């Protein structure tokens, strides 16, 4: 990799900019999705807060079930990464994950990730929160899509004996889903 001599933006020559921008774009495309995967992997050995699986295992279990059920690749990726922001902001981790993944997901999958917490509440039999809170969204075009996700792949994926494929199984999928959009973004800038 070429390195420029400048140590500030103001000192960088036109050639420096050409080198740094070109190499940056190539790397962003080559490594698309890796930052999201790394965030998920950072949860690998974290405590489970009393559940029988931790958040990382829950995520792998959910993605494995989605894959086995024949869901499409982008949906499997959305399932895998739906809780990647759990530790950043537990009470609004869906919004944070949704913001991170918005450019890379279809609208229905983005909305599903970004709003899953309020739908997940509907499956709780014990809660001080309003378990019917998702009703405010009834009629929304992605209501049923999100409810189905929470039922099939979120509330029901905390079993330590459920199949969990290795993260390596999903890495190429994440790279493809993020890479498609990254490629388009990087080549659309002047
Ligand atoms: Fe969640
Ligand atoms: Fe979850």
List each model region and its residues.
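Metal-dependent phosphohydrolase cores
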Residues: 1-80, 84-190
